[in-house]
């Protein structure tokens, strides 16, 4: 074997072996326990980033280690290939999105293969493949038939840059999740999926403390995020009667303004009502009120999510309309509020300024009445300053509430609900924050919605025999809306009902549809006759339940998908279950949300106020006296908006943040692999931090990982020079190891190796891969420190120890482990490392002939003594008093007492 570690040659040899043996192709095997582990499929943006490397290495370590432990493991990969970035890239480069997408897939696949990932590429899927999205269309039609999918017109989030509708979950702080553009409100028809029909089950399975919860293998943070998003609220829905009539003389909404509240105990404190800009009362008032109409138009510029509204300033305008308080008969003014959503509840809220912080601020701003109706003992109400106790329903008692005064929250709600019910104006009701999923997108590069619009027959589903409705592959967007709307070859079709000329639906499906079930398609990817089949039953089965339960054993991805993708995938799975396609209730048994990869961020404002970002390799830190980073400066000339900046130019240090192209703080995995090798990249990302925590990039630590692998290689070279045949034969069988005569040093080595192995095995089970690597480092230290190599027992201990190290390292650094395993002859006796058995802790190796005990004198550590493992108290005491360390630190004083902590220490009091 080569004397020096050459990562390029090592990795080439490993890949050749794996490719020749089709190493990672897997089939169903009922004789083995199955384990399905999957990373969230990537968008083919062009290149992998370090977050990908970390995610996929975590998955790879898991599947490789379990394969060694006898599991039938599946690690597939695919591409979330539809989406707006492809259209934008096509617009920029003048090429069809399909070409851009497939070119990127080819490059990123090569990068993944270079990483040595144990992916079964025979199961690869791309969501832009008609053979894949045919089943999106097929299931959509099944949902349409069952009433789960439907069409309606509704106020939606409109991204003015991407010219498309966004789901609520895709609006972050009032901006589009992809473009960052301020979202607008628009009324537009589209298709929706009734995820709300599954709200209770979605909540039950994820809710912490719920006896029906099944997702106990998910992080609590993710479970809580989903629970809050689903948002179950118990309260009272009631009406404010009115006699407001439209131009035809009819009462608007039958003369009732409905609201929902969880604080019915404060109903006697209502001083105004607020309605959404789209509410019928608002529209009626605006018809004869120009300033109000202008205000409503201004409101449409905001987004339609609670998160967006929570951040914006609360504004309103009176309508001049009044409704009647259902219990007091008082007239209550109706306002239009920019913070009220038509899509939530009835599009109206009651205003109780005294006991709602938002209403309090609104009332102060517009000088509206504030009426206190809840009192907390010992507190004083201030009409000019909000205090937290104003909204305290646990300690509060109702006041100024006529017959409802003196009641606790629970009693007041019950009494108010009863009074409203008697008047026919209200009832107890449960509401949900979750809204139906709008899947229509006014874009080209997505799954065509399989609907045909006929002037005679209306919206007609595409017949199943005509699926898939294939997306044209050669269109190039020009930036002016959806290209499908201008593609006559796609648009023109005969109505399947009447045969007359008709037009296809030009909206495409939200790309989150594609990612809601791809993990099931991996199980049976080539099936042209069914969406899922027997392979899905095998891989997506809960091994602890005959039916129901959860499917995939381990799912890995970022916490940024906690609401969007993960909630949709859960819903999609339940729909497929109800259609008889799968047997599980939930898609993912366990979820790991890996931490982000961080790096330093450096910037500088240009003369025009723009911000330039600089690559870390062009910058050096400036430190204060305490060694803290206080700034930075250029160590290489760098381009900026002000031209070429010279060495020494001061640069702002922004701390660490997620690696990002826009901030020039990313690390190219390809360059890392070329310089150090895939094993170094993998090892570094696993060693630096536990999988669930953030990883802060450190170039010096990358060098350290590379040096460690050189040490492992060099030790392998050392072993190659000795006669290993007899030792390998002994290591190959546990029984023959019992016949080996191990000397004192060899026993000590085996004790260290097997002690570390025991901990490493536990760490693998916990997926604490950083401490797995730490354990491997302890093993190489012990092997390097071992000097007695002249006996048969010593050689067996070395060969056994290094063989254990290679198997421990193999899931993390498979290339170097494979080559050393082969070169040193382990494959000939223990089999190919691909399927070599996981090393077992040898009980006899953990038996100690001697113990090392810490020696204290008057409670202070002064040294150590070694005694026989069988030594009794008298022998230990004698050894302690006779030791040089005791004699030195006792300073001639006689011992008064000897305290022995078995197996740990001896304390001599003088």
UniProtKB/Swiss-Prot annotation:
It is found in: Cytoplasm. This is Leucine--tRNA ligase. Coiled coil: none annotated. A motif ('KMSKS' region) lies at residues 658-662. The gene is leuS. Belongs to the class-I aminoacyl-tRNA synthetase family. GO terms for molecular function: aminoacyl-tRNA deacylase activity; ATP binding; leucine-tRNA ligase activity. The keyword Amino-acid biosynthesis does not apply. A motif ('HIGH' region) lies at residues 42-52. It comes from Acidovorax ebreus (strain TPSY) (Diaphorobacter sp. (strain TPSY)). Disulfide bonds: none annotated. The keyword Cell division does not apply. Its EC number is 6.1.1.4. Transmembrane segments: none annotated. Keywords: Aminoacyl-tRNA synthetase, ATP-binding, Cytoplasm, Ligase, Nucleotide-binding, Protein biosynthesis. One of its GO terms (cellular component) is cytosol. The lineage of its organism: Bacteria, Pseudomonadati, Pseudomonadota, Betaproteobacteria, Burkholderiales. It is an enzyme of class 6 (ligase). It catalyses: tRNA(Leu) + L-leucine + ATP = L-leucyl-tRNA(Leu) + AMP + diphosphate. PROSITE patterns: AA_TRNA_LIGASE_I. GO terms for biological process: leucyl-tRNA aminoacylation. ATP binds at residue 661.
């Amino acid at each position: 074997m080569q004397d020096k570690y050459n990562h390029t040659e090592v990795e080439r040899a490993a890949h050749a072996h794996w490719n020749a043996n089709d190493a990672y192709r897997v089939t169903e095997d009922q004789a083995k326990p199955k384990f399905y582990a999957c990373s969230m499929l990537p968008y083919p943006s062009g290149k992998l980033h370090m977050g990908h490397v970390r995610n996929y290495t975590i998955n790879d370590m898991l599947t490789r280690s379990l394969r060694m432990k006898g599991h039938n493991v599946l690690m597939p990969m695919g591409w979330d290939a539809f989406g707006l970035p492809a259209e934008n890239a096509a617009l920029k480069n003048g090429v069809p999105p399909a070409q851009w997408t497939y070119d990127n897939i080819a490059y990123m696949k090569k990068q993944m293969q270079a990483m040595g990932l144990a992916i079964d590429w025979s199961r690869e899927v791309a969501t832009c493949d008609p053979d894949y999205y045919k089943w999106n269309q097929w299931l959509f039609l099944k949902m349409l038939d069952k009433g789960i999918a439907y069409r309606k017109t509704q106020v939606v989030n409109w991204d003015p840059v991407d010219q498309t509708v966004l789901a609520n979950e895709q609006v972050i702080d009032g901006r589009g999740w992809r473009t960052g553009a301020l979202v607008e409100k628009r009324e537009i028809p589209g298709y929706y999926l009734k995820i709300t029909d599954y709200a209770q089950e979605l909540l039950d399975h994820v809710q912490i403390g719920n006896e029906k919860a099944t997702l106990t293998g998910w992080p609590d943070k993710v479970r809580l995020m989903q629970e809050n998003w689903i948002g179950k609220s118990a309260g009272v829905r009631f009406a404010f009667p009115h006699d407001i009539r439209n131009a035809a003389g009819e009462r608007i909404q039958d003369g009732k303004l409905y609201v929902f509240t969880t604080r019915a105990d404060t109903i006697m404190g209502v001083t105004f009502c607020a309605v959404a800009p789209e509410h019928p009362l608002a529209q009626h008032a605006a018809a004869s009120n120009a300033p109000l109409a202008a205000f409503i138009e201004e409101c449409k510029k905001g987004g339609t999510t609670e998160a967006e509204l929570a951040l914006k300033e609360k504004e309103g305008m009176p309508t001049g309309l009044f409704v009647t308080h259902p219990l007091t008969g008082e007239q209550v003014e109706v306002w239009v509020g920019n913070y009220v959503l038509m899509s939530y509840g009835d599009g109206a809220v009651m205003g109780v300024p005294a006991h709602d912080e938002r209403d309090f601020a609104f009332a102060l701003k517009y000088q509206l009445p504030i009426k206190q109706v809840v009192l907390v003992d010992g507190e004083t109400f201030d009409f000019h300053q909000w205090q937290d106790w104003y909204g305290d329903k646990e300690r509060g008692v109702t006041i100024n509430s006529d017959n409802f005064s003196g009641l606790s929250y629970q009693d007041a709600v019950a009494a108010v609900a009863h009074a409203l019910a008697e008047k026919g104006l209200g009832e107890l009701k449960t509401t949900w924050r979750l809204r139906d999923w709008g899947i229509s997108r006014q874009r080209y590069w997505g799954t065509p919605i399989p609907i045909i619009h006929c002037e005679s027959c209306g919206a007609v589903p595409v017949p199943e025999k005509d699926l898939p409705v294939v997306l044209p592959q050669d269109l190039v967007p020009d930036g002016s809306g959806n290209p499908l709307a201008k593609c006559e070859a796609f648009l023109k079709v005969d109505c399947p009902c009447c045969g007359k000329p008709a037009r296809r639906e030009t909206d495409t499906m939200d790309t989150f549809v594609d990612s809601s079930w791809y993990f099931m398609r991996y199980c049976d990817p080539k099936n042209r006759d069914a969406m899922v089949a027997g392979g899905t039953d095998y891989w997506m089965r809960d091994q602890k339940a005959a039916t129901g339960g959860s499917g995939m054993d381990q799912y890995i991805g970022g916490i940024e998908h906690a609401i969007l993708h993960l909630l949709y995938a859960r819903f999609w799975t339940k729909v497929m279950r109800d259609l008889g396609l799968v047997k599980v209730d939930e898609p993912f048994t366990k979820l790991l949300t890996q931490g982000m990869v961080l790096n330093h961020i450096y910037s500088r404002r240009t003369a025009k106020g723009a911000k330039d970002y600089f690559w870390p390799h062009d910058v050096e830190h400036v430190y204060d006296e305490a060694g803290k980073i206080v700034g930075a400066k250029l160590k290489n000339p760098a381009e900026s908006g002000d031209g070429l900046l010279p060495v020494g130019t001061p640069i702002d240090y922004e701390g660490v943040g997620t690696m990002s192209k826009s901030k020039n703080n990313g690390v190219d995995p390809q360059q890392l692999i070329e310089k150090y090798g895939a094993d170094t990249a993998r090892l570094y990302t696993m060693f630096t931090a536990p999988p669930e925590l953030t990883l802060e990039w450190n170039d010096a630590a990358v060098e350290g990982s590379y040096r460690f692998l050189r040490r492992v290689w060099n030790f392998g070279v050392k072993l190659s020079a000795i006669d290993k045949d007899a030792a390998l034969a002994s290591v190959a069988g546990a029984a023959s190891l019992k016949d080996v005569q191990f000397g004192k040093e060899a026993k000590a080595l085996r004790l260290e190796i097997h002690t570390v192995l025991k901990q490493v095995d536990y760490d693998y089970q916990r997926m604490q891969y950083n401490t797995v690597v730490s354990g491997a480092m302890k093993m190489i230290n012990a092997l390097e420190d071992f000097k007695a190599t002249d006996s048969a027992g010593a050689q067996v201990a070395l060969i056994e120890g290094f063989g254990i190290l290679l198997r421990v390292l193999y899931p993390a650094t498979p290339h170097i482990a494979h080559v050393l395993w082969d070169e040193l002859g382990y494959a000939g006796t223990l089999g190919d490392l691909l399927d070599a058995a996981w090393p077992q802790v040898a009980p006899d190796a953990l038996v100690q002939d001697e113990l090392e005990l810490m020696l204290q004198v008057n409670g202070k550590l002064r040294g150590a003594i070694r005694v026989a493992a069988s030594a009794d108290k008298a022998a230990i005491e004698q050894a302690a008093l006779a030791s040089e360390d005791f004699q030195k630190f006792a300073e001639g004083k006689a011992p008064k007492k000897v305290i022995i902590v078995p197996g740990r220490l001896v304390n001599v009091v003088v």
